[in-house]
Amino acid sequence: MQRVNMIMAESPGLITICLLGYLLSAECTVFLDHENANKILNRPKRYNSGKLEEFVQGNLERECMEEKCSFEEAREVFENTERTTEFWKQYVDGDQCESNPCLNGGSCKDDINSYECWCPFGFEGKNCELDVTCNIKNGRCEQFCKNSADNKVVCSCTEGYRLAENQKSCEPAVPFPCGRVSVSQTSKLTRAETVFPDVDYVNSTEAETILDNITQSTQSFNDFTRVVGGEDAKPGQFPWQVVLNGKVDAFCGGSIVNEKWIVTAAHCVDTGVKITVVAGEHNIEETEHTEQKRNVIRIIPHHNYNAAINKYNHDIALLELDEPLVLNSYVTPICIADKEYTNIFLKFGSGYVSGWGRVFHKGRSALVLQYLRVPLVDRATCLRSTKFTIYNNMFCAGFHEGGRDSCQGDSGGPHVTEVEGTSFLTGIISWGEECAMKGKYGIYTKVSRYVNWIKEKTKLT
């Protein structure tokens, strides 16, 4: 050992030469080849830009991808507040529009922890899920709905009403508006369904052609004169109802159009017979001090009505009164919509009929006004139920099992459909085979075919 130390001390150069020789002889690779060197130097990206590629500028990756940045730091990169805001909405919580939440063709705009749907015409709601065109639920209008030129839903009301503040509902604009029951104790009605169904508002005009289920031109059946199986109405419950007196009292009914005009069935009236109209009537054998009597000074049957050919085709007529009626809670007009909506209301499927006709076939007449709710009968069933002609200006209503119907003496009276508490005239009681017979239905004049004629003839000057 001492010898080694002596050699190292005396010959340091010799030791250095030996160490260099050892290192040069060692098999050690210091440098990597080209392919392996690239694997180390090319680190993986830590952010997949996706939809944000258009925003990647300057030092965005260094500022906001390698570490969390602030809005101000992102603003320094974009140098534009609008583009920074768009980037920031996705950077903070991701793209809220990625799941396509907007329905019915709506476009989505991302926001922080939220999104906004821009809806096309006819749709609204958080996700454009609500269809608000007139075709669906009447555009949420209480009475009438139209699509304006700029594709917006516009609600409107019948005469005597105005739009409420919400621009959807209708409120009375006159003391005694049409179709409203204003006597408080008469509010108990089994109301028809008033929610607008999803209906086709375009196909509301059918051609007036005969549905050829028969070839017979003359008919042998009963004029309706009474509601069978109905209930006693309360005073003022049907304030548009009138009774016609002539050679016989209460031979037909009718409805108040306005202070000067009554609408009834054409087969009820004869131009050579004096007719008296009584409005505000309830019990025809008692004086209740609500009655108003007027004489008829003019009868206008529909111009297509011809009793010699068919007593019940175009079965509608107008009666002009000598003095105007005084409107009150017991004397109120019935509402008459336009052709389109009268047809729509009829399709609701249920209406009220009323009158003082016979309580059963060939039986006694009613003393107190009767009323009955009757369902609309589909046209195919209606045609199969009778051998007589059912024209397109007629419709059937009633019960297959029988027992409830209008009957002799009810003719000319109203078939009304209630819409959100307001009643509209949809039919006129016309004819039927006996009364309340099983498998038979009441036949009514379809008012939608005649509303333009009614309004033209009954204008108040």
UniProtKB/Swiss-Prot annotation:
All residue ranges annotated as the Peptidase S1 domain in the record: 227-459
Keyword check for Magnesium: yes
Cellular localization per UniProt: Secreted
Location of the EGF-like domain: 93-129, 130-171
Covalent S-S links between cysteines: C64-C69, C97-C108, C102-C117, C119-C128, C134-C145, C141-C155, C157-C170, C178-C335, C252-C268, C382-C396, C407-C435
Modified residues ((3R)-3-hydroxyaspartate): D110
List of residues that carry Sulfotyrosine: Y201
Alphabetic keyword roster: Blood coagulation, Calcium, Cleavage on pair of basic residues, Disulfide bond, EGF-like domain, Gamma-carboxyglutamic acid, Glycoprotein, Hemostasis, Hydrolase, Hydroxylation, Magnesium, Metal-binding, Phosphoprotein, Protease, Repeat, Secreted, Serine protease, Signal, Sulfation, Zymogen
SUPFAM superfamilies: EGF/Laminin, GLA-domain, Trypsin-like serine proteases
Enzyme Commission number: 3.4.21.22
Active site positions: H267 (charge relay system), D315 (charge relay system), S411 (charge relay system)
Functional description taken from the UniProt entry: Factor IX is a vitamin K-dependent plasma protein that participates in the intrinsic pathway of blood coagulation by converting factor X to its active form in the presence of Ca(2+) ions, phospholipids, and factor VIIIa.
Name the UniProt record assigns to this protein: Coagulation factor IX
Organism, as annotated: Pan troglodytes
Gene: F9
